[in-house]
């Protein structure tokens, strides 16, 4: 992963005014509010009450059991999230099949694992009730990792929709590459059935909602950007597989579970190999026309909750046209976060009835809460979503709700050591600086000794 240059010293910013002035001087006009009370407001979602507007993003710990069931570390993590006060918990990606795992320790949902996954939900809800007196709204993200798939030995086993010169040479999370298999009609049909059956099992486990994952570099997202492969069942319309899954869940599960999506607003990969980009070959510039159209189609089908992301929020959808993750130039992530939040604002403004969760606030450290509140007040999004912040600071929501704001000495340091554990160490991940008892020994063993 590219080296990050952290241009701003948030520890030297003593107020929201300092934050706005310093970042605003660089053209980064984040929405901000000193009043965080909007984050505590409950709201209605699919007929249920979500206790507040603070959400935890789906972030894998790479720490499931080889069987695909949750481990003790997963139980620990979600108990901490739930007792930490967030109103919406978006459970990390669970693969619909063994061949759809991005790593050998990713959870898999099937008849053998659903019982333990259900216990995870029940115990986490109990932890939330005991700590906060509320039940969080629980979303499960289902996935097939596609070109990011790896087998039990961490060897890449990529399944792609089409050739992509910007992505074909780095299919695994560590930058390595495997022999790419191009998906057939029959394979996509198998994946569609896997998502539908996964939703059935998610309902059995007790989730409120299931996320049909359409983001990052995974298989359903790639179907949206498959402009170069028209002559097959899923080439036109490119949304066919997504809507076959949604319609199949409705038929199979009915009202037993709601449906949402986590969706790339744009891909940071040029046309004709990227989604949400200007349709000029090799041009790195976003065009939100298709994402807006898709979001409206989703809302019309009753899929109202949409969580917008991109390949990675730190990267801007501008530049040389190469996947920024894989060249050597260091980046500053703040403009990428600003671009993504603006795209969320623009898509939400053109999608009546949609409920949008934002991405990228962890990069703003203790001011993430102020931007979350400002974004909700100003109509940029409806739910303030935090990802790696929850690894480092699982009770961030509780501190906000209790009037303390976000405590800088508990915040994510955006040091990327959690990524190092995955990419270099091929091991379980979490916050090395803030959760040292568990993760510092792993970091020393699997990263520093390599």
Segments and roles (model prediction):
Residues 1-450:
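Flavin-dependent oxidoreductase catalytic cores
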